[in-house]
Protein backbone atom coordinates (compact mmCIF):
# COMPACT_ATOMS: atom_id res chain seq x y z
CA UNK A 1 0.00 0.00 0.00
CA UNK A 2 1.36 3.40 -0.99
CA UNK A 3 0.99 6.48 1.19
CA UNK A 4 0.58 10.09 0.08
CA UNK A 5 0.71 12.61 2.92
CA UNK A 6 -0.54 16.18 2.41
CA UNK A 7 0.67 18.72 4.96
CA UNK A 8 -0.49 22.33 5.08
CA UNK A 9 2.19 24.69 6.32
CA UNK A 10 2.10 26.00 9.88
CA UNK A 11 0.81 29.44 10.80
CA UNK A 12 2.50 32.21 8.81
CA UNK A 13 3.10 35.82 9.84
CA UNK A 14 0.29 37.02 7.58
CA UNK A 15 -2.03 34.26 8.84
CA UNK A 16 -1.44 35.72 12.28
CA UNK A 17 -2.12 39.25 11.00
CA UNK A 18 -5.27 38.08 9.16
CA UNK A 19 -3.96 39.25 5.78
CA UNK A 20 -4.45 37.73 2.33
CA UNK A 21 -1.11 36.08 1.49
CA UNK A 22 -1.33 34.11 -1.75
CA UNK A 23 2.01 34.11 -3.58
CA UNK A 24 3.68 36.62 -1.25
CA UNK A 25 6.59 34.96 0.53
CA UNK A 26 6.12 35.31 4.28
CA UNK A 27 7.71 33.09 6.89
CA UNK A 28 6.25 31.01 9.70
CA UNK A 29 5.50 32.44 13.11
CA UNK A 30 6.92 30.73 16.17
CA UNK A 31 3.57 28.99 16.50
CA UNK A 32 3.87 27.89 12.86
CA UNK A 33 7.29 26.37 13.52
CA UNK A 34 5.88 24.56 16.54
CA UNK A 35 3.01 23.24 14.39
CA UNK A 36 5.49 21.94 11.82
CA UNK A 37 7.59 20.34 14.54
CA UNK A 38 4.51 18.72 16.06
CA UNK A 39 3.51 17.39 12.63
CA UNK A 40 6.95 15.84 12.20
CA UNK A 41 6.79 14.27 15.65
CA UNK A 42 3.31 12.94 14.89
CA UNK A 43 4.48 11.34 11.65
CA UNK A 44 7.45 9.84 13.50
CA UNK A 45 5.22 8.32 16.20
CA UNK A 46 3.18 6.65 13.47
CA UNK A 47 6.27 5.23 11.80
CA UNK A 48 5.98 7.19 8.57
CA UNK A 49 9.04 7.22 6.34
CA UNK A 50 9.23 8.96 2.98
CA UNK A 51 11.00 8.27 -0.30
CA UNK A 52 10.37 11.67 -1.88
CA UNK A 53 8.90 15.05 -1.00
CA UNK A 54 7.37 17.98 -2.87
CA UNK A 55 6.73 21.53 -1.78
CA UNK A 56 6.08 24.96 -3.25
CA UNK A 57 8.63 27.73 -3.79
CA UNK A 58 7.28 29.71 -0.80
CA UNK A 59 9.26 29.62 2.43
CA UNK A 60 6.34 28.92 4.75
CA UNK A 61 5.79 25.58 3.01
CA UNK A 62 9.50 24.90 2.49
CA UNK A 63 10.30 25.54 6.15
CA UNK A 64 7.37 23.37 7.26
CA UNK A 65 8.80 20.57 5.14
CA UNK A 66 12.33 21.08 6.49
CA UNK A 67 11.16 21.04 10.10
CA UNK A 68 8.99 17.98 9.53
CA UNK A 69 11.76 16.06 7.79
CA UNK A 70 14.22 17.08 10.49
CA UNK A 71 11.95 15.53 13.13
CA UNK A 72 11.88 12.35 11.00
CA UNK A 73 15.68 12.47 10.52
CA UNK A 74 14.96 12.40 6.78
CA UNK A 75 16.32 15.73 5.57
CA UNK A 76 18.41 13.74 3.09
CA UNK A 77 15.52 12.54 0.90
CA UNK A 78 15.08 14.15 -2.53
CA UNK A 79 12.82 17.21 -2.56
CA UNK A 80 11.33 19.08 -5.52
CA UNK A 81 10.12 22.66 -5.11
CA UNK A 82 7.48 23.63 -7.66
CA UNK A 83 5.66 26.92 -8.21
CA UNK A 84 2.66 24.90 -9.36
CA UNK A 85 2.11 23.93 -5.70
CA UNK A 86 1.99 27.57 -4.56
CA UNK A 87 -1.01 28.94 -2.72
CA UNK A 88 -3.86 30.38 -4.75
CA UNK A 89 -3.01 33.91 -5.94
CA UNK A 90 -5.31 36.42 -4.25
CA UNK A 91 -4.79 39.19 -6.80
CA UNK A 92 -5.44 42.74 -5.63
CA UNK A 93 -6.39 41.43 -2.18
CA UNK A 94 -2.76 40.43 -1.52
CA UNK A 95 -1.52 42.07 1.67
CA UNK A 96 -4.92 43.40 2.71
CA UNK A 97 -6.41 42.69 6.12
CA UNK A 98 -9.40 40.38 5.68
CA UNK A 99 -11.67 42.24 8.10
CA UNK A 100 -10.85 45.63 6.58
CA UNK A 101 -11.42 44.22 3.09
CA UNK A 102 -14.89 43.07 4.13
CA UNK A 103 -15.65 46.56 5.43
CA UNK A 104 -14.52 48.12 2.13
CA UNK A 105 -16.07 45.72 -0.40
CA UNK A 106 -18.82 44.17 1.71
CA UNK A 107 -18.70 40.86 3.52
CA UNK A 108 -20.79 39.09 0.86
CA UNK A 109 -18.47 40.10 -1.99
CA UNK A 110 -15.36 39.07 -0.07
CA UNK A 111 -17.03 35.76 0.81
CA UNK A 112 -17.65 35.16 -2.92
CA UNK A 113 -14.01 35.88 -3.75
CA UNK A 114 -12.79 33.61 -0.98
CA UNK A 115 -15.28 30.76 -1.20
CA UNK A 116 -16.72 30.53 -4.71
CA UNK A 117 -15.04 27.92 -6.88
CA UNK A 118 -14.59 29.96 -10.03
CA UNK A 119 -14.80 33.69 -9.14
CA UNK A 120 -11.34 35.23 -8.70
CA UNK A 121 -10.65 38.49 -6.84
CA UNK A 122 -9.74 41.60 -8.89
CA UNK A 123 -6.36 41.14 -10.61
CA UNK A 124 -3.17 42.59 -9.24
CA UNK A 125 -1.72 45.48 -11.24
CA UNK A 126 1.57 44.58 -12.94
CA UNK A 127 3.24 47.54 -11.25
CA UNK A 128 2.47 46.15 -7.80
CA UNK A 129 5.53 44.89 -5.91
CA UNK A 130 3.45 41.81 -5.09
CA UNK A 131 3.15 40.84 -8.77
CA UNK A 132 5.18 37.67 -9.49
CA UNK A 133 6.76 39.26 -12.58
CA UNK A 134 9.07 41.16 -10.17
CA UNK A 135 10.14 38.01 -8.30
CA UNK A 136 13.37 36.32 -9.47
CA UNK A 137 12.12 32.85 -8.54
CA UNK A 138 9.70 33.07 -11.50
CA UNK A 139 12.19 34.51 -13.99
CA UNK A 140 12.15 31.36 -16.13
CA UNK A 141 8.38 31.41 -16.58
CA UNK A 142 6.55 32.93 -19.52
CA UNK A 143 4.42 36.02 -18.75
CA UNK A 144 1.22 34.09 -19.48
CA UNK A 145 2.16 31.56 -16.79
CA UNK A 146 2.23 34.22 -14.08
CA UNK A 147 -1.19 34.79 -12.51
CA UNK A 148 -2.40 38.22 -11.48
CA UNK A 149 -5.30 36.56 -9.63
CA UNK A 150 -6.77 33.08 -9.25
CA UNK A 151 -9.92 31.28 -8.24
CA UNK A 152 -9.70 27.73 -6.92
CA UNK A 153 -10.65 26.57 -10.43
CA UNK A 154 -7.62 28.38 -11.87
CA UNK A 155 -5.43 27.00 -9.10
CA UNK A 156 -6.54 23.50 -10.06
CA UNK A 157 -5.59 24.21 -13.68
CA UNK A 158 -1.92 24.46 -12.68
CA UNK A 159 -1.90 21.92 -9.82
CA UNK A 160 -3.54 19.05 -11.70
CA UNK A 161 -1.16 18.93 -14.70
CA UNK A 162 1.78 18.95 -12.27
CA UNK A 163 0.16 16.14 -10.33
CA UNK A 164 -0.28 14.05 -13.47
CA UNK A 165 3.08 14.83 -15.05
CA UNK A 166 5.39 14.79 -12.02
CA UNK A 167 3.83 13.49 -8.82
CA UNK A 168 1.97 10.48 -10.26
CA UNK A 169 5.16 9.01 -11.82
CA UNK A 170 6.94 9.51 -8.49
CA UNK A 171 4.15 7.68 -6.67
CA UNK A 172 4.41 4.81 -9.14
CA UNK A 173 8.13 4.49 -8.40
CA UNK A 174 8.00 5.17 -4.63
CA UNK A 175 5.98 3.89 -1.70
CA UNK A 176 5.58 7.03 0.40
CA UNK A 177 5.46 10.66 -0.78
CA UNK A 178 5.06 13.82 1.31
CA UNK A 179 3.67 17.09 -0.08
CA UNK A 180 4.02 20.20 2.10
CA UNK A 181 1.96 22.94 0.51
CA UNK A 182 -0.90 25.40 1.07
CA UNK A 183 -4.58 25.39 1.88
CA UNK A 184 -5.80 25.87 -1.69
CA UNK A 185 -3.19 23.85 -3.57
CA UNK A 186 -3.95 20.98 -1.17
CA UNK A 187 -7.68 21.61 -1.65
CA UNK A 188 -7.14 21.25 -5.42
CA UNK A 189 -5.44 17.88 -4.87
CA UNK A 190 -8.22 16.74 -2.54
CA UNK A 191 -10.86 17.68 -5.12
CA UNK A 192 -9.13 15.44 -7.65
CA UNK A 193 -8.35 12.55 -5.30
CA UNK A 194 -11.80 12.47 -3.68
CA UNK A 195 -13.75 13.26 -6.83
CA UNK A 196 -15.55 16.16 -5.16
CA UNK A 197 -17.81 18.51 -7.08
CA UNK A 198 -17.22 22.26 -7.24
CA UNK A 199 -19.57 23.07 -4.37
CA UNK A 200 -18.36 20.33 -2.03
CA UNK A 201 -14.68 21.24 -2.26
CA UNK A 202 -15.34 24.80 -1.14
CA UNK A 203 -16.64 23.46 2.19
CA UNK A 204 -13.46 21.49 2.88
CA UNK A 205 -11.23 23.03 5.54
CA UNK A 206 -7.53 22.13 5.70
CA UNK A 207 -6.00 22.19 9.17
CA UNK A 208 -2.50 23.62 9.55
CA UNK A 209 0.18 21.20 10.68
CA UNK A 210 -2.06 18.10 10.65
CA UNK A 211 -0.85 15.47 8.15
CA UNK A 212 -3.61 14.15 5.88
CA UNK A 213 -2.80 10.56 4.91
CA UNK A 214 -4.05 8.91 1.73
CA UNK A 215 -3.50 5.17 1.36
CA UNK A 216 -3.38 4.25 -2.32
CA UNK A 217 -3.37 0.93 -4.15
CA UNK A 218 -0.94 0.18 -6.98
CA UNK A 219 -3.30 1.87 -9.46
CA UNK A 220 -3.22 4.96 -7.17
CA UNK A 221 -6.89 4.60 -6.29
CA UNK A 222 -7.76 5.86 -2.81
CA UNK A 223 -8.26 3.02 -0.33
CA UNK A 224 -8.32 5.06 2.88
CA UNK A 225 -8.00 8.67 3.98
CA UNK A 226 -7.53 10.09 7.47
CA UNK A 227 -5.95 12.92 9.39
CA UNK A 228 -3.08 11.50 11.39
CA UNK A 229 -4.14 13.31 14.55
CA UNK A 230 -7.38 11.29 14.50
CA UNK A 231 -5.34 8.09 14.91
CA UNK A 232 -2.97 9.43 17.55
Swiss-Prot record:
Q: Which domain of life is it from?
A: Bacteria
Name its pathway.
Answer: Carbohydrate degradation; glycolysis; pyruvate from D-glyceraldehyde 3-phosphate: step 3/5
Broad class of enzyme this protein falls into: isomerase
Calcium as UniProt keyword: no
Coiled-coil ranges (or none)? none
The record's section on SUPFAM superfamilies has:
Phosphoglycerate mutase-like (SSF53254)
Which residues of this protein are annotated with the site description Transition state stabilizer?
A: 182
Residues at which substrate binds: 8-15, 21-22, 60, 87-90, 98, 114-115, 183-184
Name of the featured protein: 2,3-bisphosphoglycerate-dependent phosphoglycerate mutase
Region labeled Disordered — which residues? 116-137
What are the GO MF terms of this UniProt record?
A: phosphoglycerate mutase activity
Q: Provide the E.C. number(s) assigned to this enzyme.
A: 5.4.2.11
Q: Which organism is it from?
A: Alkalilimnicola ehrlichii (strain ATCC BAA-1101 / DSM 17681 / MLHE-1)
Report keywords, A-Z.
Gluconeogenesis, Glycolysis, Isomerase
Q: Which Pfam families match?
A: His_Phos_1 (PF00300)
- Signal peptide stretch: none
**Active site: which residues?**
9, 87
Checking PANTHER family in the record gives:
PHOSPHOGLYCERATE MUTASE
Q: Which reaction does it catalyse?
A: (2R)-2-phosphoglycerate = (2R)-3-phosphoglycerate
Complex and partners: Homodimer.
Question: What does this chain do?
Answer: Catalyzes the interconversion of 2-phosphoglycerate and 3-phosphoglycerate.
The entry sums up its family as follows:
Belongs to the phosphoglycerate mutase family. BPG-dependent PGAM subfamily.
Amino acid sequence: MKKLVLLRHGQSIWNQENRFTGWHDVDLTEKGREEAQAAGQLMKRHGLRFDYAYTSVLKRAIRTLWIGLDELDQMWIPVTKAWQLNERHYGALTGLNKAETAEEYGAEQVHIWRRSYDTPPPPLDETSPYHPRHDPRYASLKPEQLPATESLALTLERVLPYWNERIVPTLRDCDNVLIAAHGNSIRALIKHLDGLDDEAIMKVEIATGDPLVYELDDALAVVDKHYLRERD
